[in-house]
């Protein structure tokens, strides 16, 4: 049997981390079994579904490289198919038309609640033989079995059972002729030959209804697996303040897709004590029986740690392709400066996100208008004039511009003046970067370049001279 899974989001908002994790688990299960992964857009909620949300879902899936083998399918383009199946069910007697008014249904609901009963349809039209005009408004309900129970073996939670007496007759077509969500899902899973449905635990109560409809259609019943919810680190339902933002917001905030995928796969699944997983390892090791039944806690610090790891572990040339977008957002012209792959090597240890990296690198490519006030006050003092002049001249004399030779020039300056490296290094750092912090000074000066470094040292010497004149 060919394994076939699906990810079926509703395009009423962005692709959030919970949806992304569900997509990842479905994708991994299919890949682990050499099966196929289907993308289906469940856009039957015409009022809330938007083209922008569909685009956001696609963008998120593509950024995470969760490529689909079929689709995307759109439910709104399949209404003829759904209605044909409903008409077939009406003929076979597994569905019936219901003419009950909203007023009757509301009165029934209030009466049941007053008695402490669970609100449910009482089946009046199921057994009615009244004649109705063809154009009289009605809904179509599924004739749910009235005896027995529905049992399914959830691949994460184990056997789950629902009594059919707890399930009323579900509306499968509205008065306007549009099919309802639970029915569309059933027909889609049937037509698309889905073998395994992996989705959030909020769908557990839909499952017995969907199984009963599938059985009425004499269609195969897929295997179900319901993934637990994601909470914030305080144990409360995940919300924006915990980090429940769109997948693309993580891109905007400077995270690598590998980091987010690695974080999401471990958010409810484990393989021994291993924390770092390549995509290939995820595919190789992923099983549903290793997915936890308990809710997972979202921890931004852990995600940040993983991101820092991947910035330094992945090939710099690859990381640079993602950094490029952030550089463009900062409007930095990188034509006159180090290659982005070299920048990744320079700043990788210091920066935990690509956004931080893009906001920390401008001095490598563009001259700064002024020095950081605190750094200049502390390090660009008259006592720094001589070290800067000497190191400038030694840098100017370098014929083979390498980080090693830059280091020798700084060391030689300290030796010549009989001062510690800090007496040379700190003024030089402020002079060439405009600030008091940077990667190792020799590689920083080397990356900035010989001509630009000397020009900036001269600018710092002018700053010191002006400072002296003002005293």
Curated annotation (Swiss-Prot):
Enzyme class: ligase
Motif ('KMSKS' region): 237-241
Location relative to the cell: Cytoplasm
UniProt record similarity statement: Belongs to the class-I aminoacyl-tRNA synthetase family. Glutamate--tRNA ligase type 1 subfamily.
Protein name: Glutamate--tRNA ligase
Any one Gene Ontology BP term: glutamyl-tRNA aminoacylation
PROSITE patterns, per database record: AA_TRNA_LIGASE_I
Gene Ontology molecular function, alphabetical: ATP binding; glutamate-tRNA ligase activity; tRNA binding; zinc ion binding
Gene Ontology CC annotations of this record: cytosol
Cofactor note: Binds 1 zinc ion per subunit.
